[in-house]
Structures are given as C-alpha cells and as structure tokens.
Amino acid sequence: MPKHPAAKAPPEQQTSLHLQSFLPYRLVVLADQVSHCIAHIYSDRFNLTRPEWRALVALVELGPVSATEIAAHSTLDKMSTSRAIKGLEEKGYLRRADAAEDRRNKIINLTAAGRGLYNKIAPLVLAQETYLLEIFSADERSMLDRLLRGLEQRAQDLQKQN
C-alpha cells in the first residue's frame, strides 16, 4: 500500500473538498452530537466527566485491572485515565489495591457504589442508543456495524502509514 493513498486519487478529488460532505468532518460532527446527548446524562445528572464514565464502563467490562488496561480499553491517554481514576476514587466509586505480584502496581476495582452508579446510568444511555438506531432495520443495523468496523480498520491502517 502506498505511503499516501490520496496520491492515487485524480487531481479533481484532491483539490475539491466540500466540508459538509467530507467524511471525517461528518463523523466528527455526528460523534460530537451523540456524545453531547449522552454526556448530558452522566455529566449533568450524575456529575461524571467523560473520562470518568469511560473508566467506569471499562471497569465493569474488564473487572479489576490496572490503570494501563483501563486506558487501553477506553482509548484514554494516561493523564485522562489518572484523573478519571482519582475522581472516581474520591467519589467512592472505585478503590485501588496493591497488585499481588508487584506492590508498586495498583489494581483498580469498582465499589458497590460504583456498580450501582453504572446500573443507574447504563439503561439511560442505552435508551439513547436505541433511539438513534431504531430508524434502521435489523439488517441495516448489521450493515452499519460492518461499515463502521471497516472504517475503523482503514483509519487504523492510515494511522500506521503516517
């Protein structure tokens, strides 16, 4: 695959860009719109930041893990992960303990309050997702999932090339 795939495109495609139909722009706008609607739930109603919510969900999905594993699973950078963990710990939603194999490492686990908070928020954000997707048939939702996975893979390929 060439270093810069766009170099293969005809010149008119390289110089004529219409923002409203430019896929990266449309994806960012859509992601922002959806994210703001969902953030309203966990931020305004439950006083969580976006990184705190993502870390909380990662802990539900992964169980007791290190901060590094939370960061990797939720695509948060180290600083955001650290702040999210600190914030959740201060709010009583998680606790840190020394790792058995190396006391310098910490294992992070949800508290009962953290699990309870997740159980309150998850149905609300899942209802938002259901609302967004109910305009599609089951086949269309399946196709959308395949298309998104394809775009994610291509974006990862582009990142590796750059």
What are these regions (language model features)?
Residues 1-46:
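N-terminal leader segment of winged-helix/HTH proteins
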Residues 1-16, 139-162:
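C-terminal regulatory/oligomerization modules of transcriptional regulators
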Residues 3-8, 73, 86-146:
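Charged, amphipathic alpha-helical coiled-coil/dimerization segments
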Residues 18, 36-80, 160-162:
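N-terminal helix-turn-helix DNA-binding core of bacterial DNA-binding proteins
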Residues 28-39, 43, 67-71, 77, ...:
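A broad helix-preferring feature
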Residues 32, 57-61, 122, 149:
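Short, locally clustered residues in the helix-turn-helix/winged-helix DNA-binding domain
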Residues 34-41, 74, 117-133, 151-162:
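Alpha-helical linker/hinge and terminal dimerization helices associated
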